[in-house]
Amino acid sequence: ISNPGGYLTDIPAVAAVAERLGVPLIVDNTLATPYLCNPIAQGATLVVHSTTKYLTGNGTVMGGVVVDSGNFDWSASDKFPSLSAPEPAYHGLKFHETFGALAFTFHGIAIGLRDLGMTLNPQAAHYTLMGIETLSLRMQRHVKNAMKIATWLENDPRVDFVTYAGLPSSPYFERGKRLYPKGAGALFTFAVKGGYEACVKLVDNVEIFSHVANLGDTRSLIIHSASTTHRQLTPEQQEAAGAAANVVRLSIGTEDADDLIRDLDQALSAAVN
């Protein structure tokens, strides 16, 4: 699931191309989470997550994970010498020859961890494990809330369009039913009539939504990317990134959906004359 628009990737189709070219497919599954999508079952080689988002669920940690499917032959070509060729630092050891299906994982530990030092601190690991215990329950609420709010926004005359893939009007709707049957996530954008200034006013007037650049939180978050995270880009670049001047991004949380709708309603009234 893409950021910011929440578009749904056809992983099996991309996986087929990757297999034909002899390259690994790496999927960032942060926004879908393992609850909504299992990329390895759809053909991915590696899956990455920002654990700061839904896995922990409350924005209290910084972390990430890499999940290795173990289904890629790193020695099938000369494209991956770090895994198939002798490693001088380990007396000529060949990672794929020695560790087989776990070659990438052990290379990440023996080389990546050694050189870069990325280690999740124990407290962050504890919070993350606690978050994962409630992942399925939270994602059900995230998706339910997102669908209700996106439907309301789509029917509001102050809104030009909504990108939520769970809506029947979305070009990704059928793909979602096929590949993401549990839901299309909880991140999407919508365009506000009134453009840039109206979006800024909207964000300034919300009371329940938090104006934060993070996503995947139990708290509902809002941001106008064109005036914040994507401000340095040209209008053409913003448009290409899905962060045009008239677009606001929402990360829907687990609060009461009707409360969130009332908050957006009053903020839109303040923003759009």
Regions found by a protein language model. Give the residues of each.
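Conserved PLP-enzyme active-site core in the AAT-like
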Residues: I1-D156
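PLP-dependent enzyme catalytic core of the Aspartate aminotransferase-like
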Residues: S2, D10-I11, R138, D204, ...
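Structural preference for beta-strand elements that scaffold enzyme active sites
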Residues: P24, L46, F161, L187, ...
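Alpha-helical elements of the RecA-like P-loop NTPase motor core of helicases
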Residues: C37, T151, V200, D258-R262
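Short glycine-enriched loop/turn motifs at secondary-structure junctions
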Residues: G59-T60, K182-A184, A243-N246
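Short hydrophobic/aromatic beta-strand micro-patches
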Residues: V67, T189-A191, S251-G253
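Short, glycine-/Ser/Thr-/acidic-enriched flexible segments
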Residues: N71-F72, S169, K193-G195, S227-T228, ...
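Conserved small-domain helix->loop->beta segment predominantly found in fold-type I
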Residues: L116-N121, A125, M130, T134, ...
